[in-house]
Amino acid sequence: MSNHRLPESLLDDIALAIKTHRSIPPLPKGISVEDAYAALPHLVKRVTGDRPGGLKAGVTNTDIQAFLGLEEALLGMLYESSAASDGLVLPFVKGRKIECEMGIRLNADGSPLSVGPAVELVNLDFSVPEDLTAGNLVLCNMGTDRFILGNMTPWDQFDFGLLTEVEITVIHDGKTR
């Protein structure tokens, strides 16, 4: 039995859109962040059939939080099967975004174990622009698609000052961008 209040058919439709890189279908009005968080594990299972591969923070920009009426960032789930390796070659997907991130591995109690560079590929396209709400962002898992973790360093040995020296290279059609 589900512990959420959203229609199963809605989760099926969203999962299909995510898996096929299509626009998210029109969503019912008034989906709360709380309802979306309750439904999110059920969506992840529909998308991948496997367990989450980790957590992701989203809407970390305070201006966007204010626009969406939030006081803190949102959390989503990374798909375990979506972990990719350096040098990944992907087909073009209209609207896909590339986000440079920091990956942090946590132990079971949530304490940081290691940290390193990460790249997240995000694909989120609402068919109805007005559907861009905090609850709907959570419900659609904030566009989680693929992610790449770089070399991880033990948390207590990481020099956070080196972050200004990180270089990322994107190659598109054989050209460095």
Model-derived features with residue positions:
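Catalytic-core "active-site belt" of small-molecule-metabolizing enzymes
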Residues: N3-R177
